Amino acid sequence: MIYKVFYQETKDQSPRRESTKALYLNIDATDELDGRIKARRLVEDNTYYNVEFIELLSDKHLDYEKETGVFELTEF
């Protein structure tokens, strides 16, 4: 399952929509909730990012992300 993780690069400042970034993770999970938990843990263990939101991408949404050219899987 591919998850899109929205985050701020620092926890020192309050989140601002203009500085929100995203990364994509391929997570082996039994269901959506398990995938969100694993994605959050993976990001928090490997970065200092402030995770805002984690979303499971549908096939259509994933195709759109690939078409826009911003899609790149992140590996830790």
UniProtKB/Swiss-Prot annotation:
Entry keyword annotation includes Nucleotidyltransferase: yes
GO terms classed as biological process: DNA-templated transcription
InterPro entries, per database record: RpoY
GO molecular function: DNA binding; DNA-directed RNA polymerase activity
EC number: 2.7.7.6
Enzyme class: transferase
Annotated keywords: DNA-directed RNA polymerase, Nucleotidyltransferase, Transcription, Transferase
Keyword Nucleotidyltransferase: yes
A Gene Ontology term for the protein's cellular component: DNA-directed RNA polymerase complex
Record field: catalytic activity: RNA(n) + a ribonucleoside 5'-triphosphate = RNA(n+1) + diphosphate
Family to which the UniProt record says this protein belongs: Belongs to the RNA polymerase subunit epsilon family.
Subunit and partners: RNAP is composed of a core of 2 alpha, a beta and a beta' subunit. The core is associated with a delta subunit, and at least one of epsilon or omega. When a sigma factor is associated with the core the holoenzyme is formed, which can initiate transcription.
Main function: A non-essential component of RNA polymerase (RNAP).
Protein name: DNA-directed RNA polymerase subunit epsilon
Gene designation: rpoY
